[in-house]
């Protein structure tokens, strides 16, 4: 148990999080954390559908640019890489919409379960 506590404390360390963020490498393509989502999950698709047009366009632009960079085997210049702090601020653009969709889904399931008890 002590080992697990030390491990969790190490993982939650901001220095380790920044280090791991750099290892993941998606920032080299100019992508944010929420640019990766499960395209087969209905909740994620609904959250993307609810994005405001400007956020959706920015998301699409980042994906197209990253695809082009991957095809040409290049990375963005280091000045254009999103920092860890920027990713924590701007990079979680889909999370509020996804949380909203999940709450609606849970509420709908609870309502159906309530109605089916009778």
UniProtKB/Swiss-Prot annotation:
Instruction: Give the InterPro entries listed for this entry.
Output: QCR7 (IPR003197), QCR7_sf (IPR036544)
State the function annotated in the UniProt record: Component of the ubiquinol-cytochrome c oxidoreductase, a multisubunit transmembrane complex that is part of the mitochondrial electron transport chain which drives oxidative phosphorylation.
Q: Which UniProt keywords apply?
A: Allergen, Electron transport, Membrane, Mitochondrion, Mitochondrion inner membrane, Respiratory chain, Transport
Subcellular localization is given as:
Mitochondrion inner membrane
Topological relation to the membrane, as annotated: Peripheral membrane protein
What subunit structure does UniProt give? Component of the ubiquinol-cytochrome c oxidoreductase (cytochrome b-c1 complex, complex III, CIII), a multisubunit enzyme composed of 3 respiratory subunits cytochrome b, cytochrome c1 and Rieske protein, 2 core protein subunits, and additional low-molecular weight protein subunits. The complex exists as an obligatory dimer and forms supercomplexes (SCs) in the inner mitochondrial membrane with cytochrome c oxidase (complex IV, CIV).
Q: Which family does it belong to?
A: Belongs to the UQCRB/QCR7 family.
Segments of this protein annotated with the region IgE-binding. Immunodominant epitope: 1-32
Protein name (Swiss-Prot/TrEMBL): Cytochrome b-c1 complex subunit 7
Example GO biological process term? mitochondrial electron transport, ubiquinol to cytochrome c
Q: Which organism is it from?
A: Dermatophagoides farinae
- Which terms in the GO cellular component ontology are assigned? matrix side of mitochondrial inner membrane; respiratory chain complex III
């Amino acid at each position: 148990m002590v080992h697990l506590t030390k491990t969790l404390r190490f993982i939650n360390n901001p220095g380790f999080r920044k280090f791991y963020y750099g290892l993941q490498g998606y920032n080299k393509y100019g992508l944010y954390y929420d640019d990766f989502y499960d395209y087969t999950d209905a909740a994620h698709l609904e959250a993307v559908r609810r994005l405001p047009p400007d956020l959706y366009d920015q998301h699409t632009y980042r994906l197209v640019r990253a695809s082009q960079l991957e095809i040409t085997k290049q990375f963005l210049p280091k000045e254009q890489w999103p920092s860890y702090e920027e990713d924590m601020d701007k990079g979680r653009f889909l999370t509020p919409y996804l949380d909203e969709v999940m709450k609606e889904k849970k509420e709908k399931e609870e309502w159906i379960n309530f109605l089916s008890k009778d």
